[in-house]
């Protein structure tokens, strides 16, 4: 992964080197250790704040070169706004602000993890460190020539805390979680000639090093299972399909697992119903759901989560050739239900149909959550700030909404109902794979619901959040890694053994 920042924790008494970072509120007040570290430079800070009209607003930063009275070569004062308003996600964002101030080349950074009232808690300092790593991620593997102002970053960030041991303990699961997010980002950012189904499966299989059980289904295995919906999508590509089943057994032996299913269309041309050429290159990211599931499984295994989990991803390419699926074809899914193909560019739901059915019937999970860059319609409805949430279970939907608000990876519940079924009724088969333009994200979810049977289930349409979403305080990457933090928190809060 393109991780260019190392983060560690040191005692508050550590002398600052290179760049010194402190925090202040809207009154420009800092904590006692911060004031001690600043020494006589406090006056220089006040003058600079007045000159630049720095007010200590949340996320605002005052950058001072060679501050008088300090051995540090740079001083950055970051505003926190009103301390009483700070929530967990705000510390991630503050960490992102730190990362945004890092220069190119080697740089030593000391951060005083302190609020005006005193030291940050271990959890707050851990979130700060995670925010630094999330923002600092960069994907530039294929650039052979870099501009002078785009030199490689090699920063060492030392976060000064009151209790080093407790903060390290709090950061350990956060560190694995950031690794999981960055794995998901890396997968989404890779070009499609590099990351095709077999290569994706190979990378997912590397989770075995963390104790994750791996099963890879090739085309003969899926043919034997009668996964006709998934294989129909894949038949136009020279790159054979794969389905990868990942299992983490961290809970009680024999306890039913929870399950996460990801759409993994490694490149989507639309097939015979071919897409316009403009922005087709973005369809390398049509496997954002599968990338999230792999990143999530890494995060859970890295912290040895006390829960049994299944992660399943269907990996295909949707390509046009003489053997490609045609509009008008009828395929038989693993469930035995038949599907008339109206539009070959409505392929993700076909992939998910077979993988959802496989997981529901073979592993009998307590619930399933699927993630998919499924419809452009969800972007019309929600833009790029929220993922669409569809569910047949109110408790699961409520929990997803709550952890979305806590992590900043927000969801918005959309309707399901039998009234929408008529849009996907077929004259020739049990159903067709797309309806009218109206309510397109809803009818896609309504289609998926036919393949979960009675299993509690939620569908996250992440077309607007997984890739090319707006850059934020903690993400500057085209592939955002959306969903890893959301689902990790869902598991930790509601489903792990305490």
UniProtKB/Swiss-Prot annotation:
Protein name, entry field: Probable cytosol aminopeptidase
Textual note on the cofactor: Binds 2 manganese ions per subunit.
Function per UniProt: Presumably involved in the processing and regular turnover of intracellular proteins. Catalyzes the removal of unsubstituted N-terminal amino acids from various peptides.
Signal peptide (from-to): none
Lineage: Bacteria, Pseudomonadati, Pseudomonadota, Alphaproteobacteria, Hyphomicrobiales
A GO CC term assigned to this protein in UniProt: cytoplasm
Enzyme class: hydrolase
Reactions mediated catalytically: Release of an N-terminal amino acid, Xaa-|-Yaa-, in which Xaa is preferably Leu, but may be other amino acids including Pro although not Arg or Lys, and Yaa may be Pro. Amino acid amides and methyl esters are also readily hydrolyzed, but rates on arylamides are exceedingly low; Release of an N-terminal amino acid, preferentially leucine, but not glutamic or aspartic acids
Organism: Rhodopseudomonas palustris (strain BisA53)
Keywords noted in UniProt: Aminopeptidase, Cytoplasm, Hydrolase, Manganese, Metal-binding, Protease
Keyword Transit peptide carried by entry: no
Positions with a binding annotation for Mn(2+) 1: 268, 345, 347
């Amino acid at each position: 992964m393109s991780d260019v920042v190392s983060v560690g924790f040191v005692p508050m008494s550590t002398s600052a080197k290179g760049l010194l970072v402190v925090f202040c509120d809207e009154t420009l007040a800092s904590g006692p250790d911060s004031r001690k570290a600043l020494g006589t430079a406090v006056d220089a800070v006040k003058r600079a704040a007045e000159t630049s009209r720095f007010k200590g607003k949340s996320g605002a930063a005052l950058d001072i070169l060679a501050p008088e009275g300090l051995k540090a070569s740079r001083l950055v004062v970051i505003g926190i706004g009103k301390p009483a308003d700070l929530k967990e996600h705000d510390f991630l964002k503050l960490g992102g602000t730190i990362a945004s101030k890092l220069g190119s080349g080697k740089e030593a950074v000391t951060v005083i993890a302190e609020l005006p009232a005193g030291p940050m808690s271990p959890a707050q300092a851990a979130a700060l460190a995670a925010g630094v790593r999330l923002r600092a991620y960069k994907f530039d593997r294929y650039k052979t020539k870099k501009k002078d102002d785009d030199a490689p970053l090699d920063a060492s960030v030392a976060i000064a805390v009151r209790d080093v041991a407790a903060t390290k303990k709090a950061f350990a699961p956060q560190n694995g979680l950031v690794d999981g997010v960055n794995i998901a980002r890396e997968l989404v950012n890779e070009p499609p000639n590099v990351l095709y189904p077999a290569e994706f499966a190979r990378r997912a299989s590397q989770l075995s090093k963390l104790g994750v059980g791996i099963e890879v289904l090739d085309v003969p295995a899926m043919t034997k299972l009668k996964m006709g919906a998934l294989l129909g999508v894949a038949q136009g590509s020279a790159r054979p399909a794969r389905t990868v089943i990942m299992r983490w057994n961290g809970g009680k032996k024999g306890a039913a697992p929870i399950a996460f299913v990801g759409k993994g269309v490694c490149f989507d041309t639309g097939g015979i119903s071919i897409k316009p050429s403009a922005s087709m290159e973005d369809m390398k990211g049509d496997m954002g759901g599968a990338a999230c599931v792999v990143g999530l499984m890494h995060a859970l295994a890295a912290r040895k989560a006390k829960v049994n989990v299944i992660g399943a991803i269907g990996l295909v390419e949707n390509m046009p050739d003489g053997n490609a699926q045609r509009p008008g074809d009828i395929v038989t899914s693993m469930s035995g239900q038949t599907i008339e193909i109206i539009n070959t560019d409505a392929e993700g739901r076909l992939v998910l149909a077979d993988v959802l059915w496989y997981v529901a019937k073979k592993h009998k999970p307590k619930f399933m959550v699927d993630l998919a860059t499924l419809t452009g319609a969800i972007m019309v409805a929600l833009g790029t700030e929220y993922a669409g949430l569809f569910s047949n279970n109110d408790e699961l939907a409520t929990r997803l909404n709550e952890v979305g608000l806590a992590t900043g990876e927000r969801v918005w519940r959309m309707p399901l109902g039998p009234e929408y079924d008529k849009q996907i009724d077929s004259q020739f088969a049990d159903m067709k794979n797309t309806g009218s333009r109206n309510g397109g994200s809803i009818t896609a979810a309504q289609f998926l619901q036919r393949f979960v049977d009675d299993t509690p289930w939620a569908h996250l349409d992440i077309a607007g959040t997984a890739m090319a979403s707006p850059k934020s305080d903690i993400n500057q990457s085209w592939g955002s890694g959306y969903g890893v933090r959301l689902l990790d928190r869902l598991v930790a809060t509601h489903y792990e053994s305490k």
